[in-house]
Amino acid sequence: DWESLIKLIKEINENIKEYKSIDFECLVVNDASTIAQPELIKPNNIKSLQILNMKQNRGHARCNAFGIRYIFKNKNFDYLILMDGDGEDRPVEIKSLVNEVTKNTNISIVAKRVKRSEGPFFQLLYQTHKIITYIFTGKKINFGNYSCLIKKDVEKLHSAASLWSSYSGTVKLFLKDLSEINSIRGLRYFGPSQMSLFKLLIHSFSIIAVFKYQVFLRSTFIIIFLAYFSEYLGNTSIFFQIFIVLFNLIL
């Protein structure tokens, strides 16, 4: 979405203008867009603007992984801010990320979602997703891509195989110390949200799959619990036991 990208870059430029002593470089990962790339003009507060073109659209997770790996191997940097390019990660919150990481330069920052812009039905599904993720992994994952990573943590993440399927899951698995800022999920600059029910399910599975060992252990305890109370739960117990077994086989 080049139209969104152009607006995003302008807003980033506006929100970083007060940080005169910090050099900001912008790397855009193009997920094989079929729309002709327009001429992009580098704003005055951004030191450099570079486009990395993917050969195929393999999804945002692979784009993230590709960009993170490229930056670690090819760029000289202290911090990496990762964000979506459609406006849902609000550029105004870059200030909060920078200010927070300035207070403690040795801990990566994630943008915790405290409010979303979707309708009530989708928000209900999203809360269900977070509960299921917590039950099976024991991890409270309340953030997406929007984050500020210290270089040491980028080094930990860039070679992780799970990064190619889930950024937030990989961050939670490999980084034990994380700080956070409160973040409001913004509206897309152009068009409706691209997060459908199917994509939300894929998103959930991708996160849970990162924690296969924890999922197996927790599933075992849940099955034992259901079997013990099967006399009271009846066919419901059998249904959930079968579901959990199939769930683990899929992972």
Language-model regions, residue ranges each:
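Acceptor/aglycone-binding surface of glycosyltransferases and processive sugar-polymer synthases
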Residues: 54-70, 79-82, 88-165, 187-191, ...
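Membrane-embedded multi-pass helical conduit in multi-pass membrane proteins
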Residues: 216-251
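A conserved acidic beta->alpha catalytic loop
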Residues: 1, 30-39, 87-88
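Catalytic donor/gating beta->alpha subdomain of glycosyltransferases that bind UDP-sugars
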Residues: 101, 155-214
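Short beta-strand/loop segment that forms part of the nucleotide-sugar
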Residues: 9, 22-33, 52
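Residue-level recognition of the N-termini of beta-strands and the immediately preceding loop/turn
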Residues: 22-26, 49, 78-83
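Short, well-formed alpha-helical segments that are part of the catalytic scaffolds
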Residues: 1-17
